[in-house]
Amino acid sequence: MPERKAVRKADQKAGQKADQKAVRKVEQKAGQTADRCPVPRPVDSIDAGSLWPEIEKILAPGQGDRAASDAILADIEAGTALARTQSSLLRAPDPVVAALLSTLERQVAEGRASLPDQRHSATDPSWMTRADFCYLSVRACAHDGVSGSFIQAAKLLPAIAADAIHLAPFHPIHFDVVYAPESPSVVDPALADPVLSAAGIGPENQLRAFIRACRLLGKAIGYDLMPHVAQFARVALERPSLFRWIHLDDKRAGLVDADPSRPYGREEREEVAGMVAGICVSAKDNYGISSLKRMEGDDEATTAAKDRAYYTAIRMCIENGIWQVPCHAWNGAGAPAFSGYDHAADYPVFAYRNDRGEDVSAEAYGVSSPYAFYDGLLPNSITEPDSIPIPNDAAIDYFSSIFSGWSALHGFDFVRMDAVDRLLWSSLDTEGTLPVSDGLTPLVVRRALQAARKGHPGIGALATRYGTEVEEFAREGFDLLMGSDMMRRIDAPLLREALALHDRLVERNADPSLHRATVCFAVDAHETSSTRQWGAAMATIMGPVRMGLRHAVARFLSVGGGRRPLYEVMGFQDLSTGLYESSLATRGLQWNDNAAFASAYAATEALYRRLRPFLDTAAIAGRYVCGTYAWWIIVPAGRSGPPHRVVVVALSLETGEGLDPGHIDIPLTSSWGELEGRVHHIPGSTGAEVSVTGSLVLQLKFLECVIVDLEPSQSFY
């Protein structure tokens, strides 16, 4: 179209492109010209220390509720993991948790207890390597016809042994998918308890109450940062310049005014963003509103007007052939390529290919769209010398501000960065600036983490990398990797690799000049039942014995400088299932209420807590792994002469035959003399007495773990 080209040429010459003006106009009208995510303060904000007493007044606990609360409090004050199941705590009346947390709040107010220092206020994020983590989804707390809400989520906290909560996304969503957010700056009102909302404690304050509950119970809290939003998310319509778009012709057969081989340049993005901006302004003007974003405090009429304007804007975009470009597959090259239009379903079809031209559409999720961190990506192809992608600073800055906004307002202690599993292979240059595809690059990650830690150097960072490249990820600013243990059985190859990783971590973390970092031992993760992984819940596939063995290995292989934080998920404690499914549909877990497993979980945690002061300063002195069993010996680190304590861990490994290892003989250093102590079977006994000299003889059953705690006989207690 020569007319359009002439207009563009004139605009370029004047430095005032029409599309940029349109984008600027809509963002000014929405009050969102700054490249930051505008996280709003709660309406009628309540002092954090007053939230649970106020909730207690609203819910009015009765005598029975207070008795139940006192019983839970007694268990907490005993200092051991609760043997009560998460299912039973969840099904307790709401006033019980209100009474419990209000009591803890009064103890703080009266000086009988103190809140632990908030981890993000630390001088560095090394606390992450000493913490343990649990994934918790508010929506998945639904049960027995009760919707998942922040107050339901707070009920689970006393039965979670981990001291850091990885909070799943809590924003409004599309397609019922938790990881397809509509806006990263709003708390989803669907996660708010309606009784509390009606009483004046809205969604933002209910989130604050949950975070306060974590603080009262000594737990850090983490935010889940996503580099994408739902397709046609509200933020995409109001901030279109942050995203990548296509504009189709009237027949939906091809792109308008864009080279199909290079459709994702800055000029193309800004032009279509200007059209989206104009559509958004028109829709908002028609309904008399200034923003599409649903805000706490909006009355019913305003909310309805915003929704009508929002869906009108989506319809107008579709009618004009304008679509957001979806996320590429994790192993894709460049950005997805428009390949046709499904006229029956009325949506564009994209091709997803890797750098070898192979179809990788099976790995793609078409419901979300990435921030346009770079302009100039090629369709299904990596960068060419004459088409170097250019950073889109506005998108990078906006993404980098999301966590900072939430942390500044609510005090989040760490960020879990989603979609970084391929980070080490995401760029073509050593500086991490030239992207292979539309995902995060080291450049973007570094800027986001720098923004997160500005003024708060203690902010931690967890990478969703299912690997052990701790050195490389630490250089980018991460403190933890997820690891891949949740994808494997406890067998000889895993133990050999885990012990080798332990040695790597010990050597690395002994160097004070390096950023301290480690790898989690994940007993489970929220997505392990997906078809890309196990295909069903691990608890269902493995059963209580194998899950208990995973728990024991995670705890007692974590020694000294090779410590690996436990990573668990809500429901693990009583083998409840359905966490992945709850991220794709509005539903809760299948609350299995397995009291026997919860009791075994509590026993393992109690033993670990008793041994932890020793384990944290100890070292693995000897080890052995064969096809059917493994053992390792833990002694004080850096000590010459006979040790004052020895802990031996022995376990039967997963095998195809499923036979008992039977009699095993573990050699001990003869100069240690006679040792005596207790043998703890997991799961099983609380500890039988034993006395040994020179070697330790054990009988191992299939999939059994045995912990032997020994001291020199003259000092045995």
Question: Where on the chain are the PLM-derived regions?
Answer:
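Long, intrinsically disordered low-complexity tandem-repeat segments
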Residues: 4-34
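Active-site and adjacent substrate-binding regions of carbohydrate-active enzymes
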Residues: 2-5, 31-717
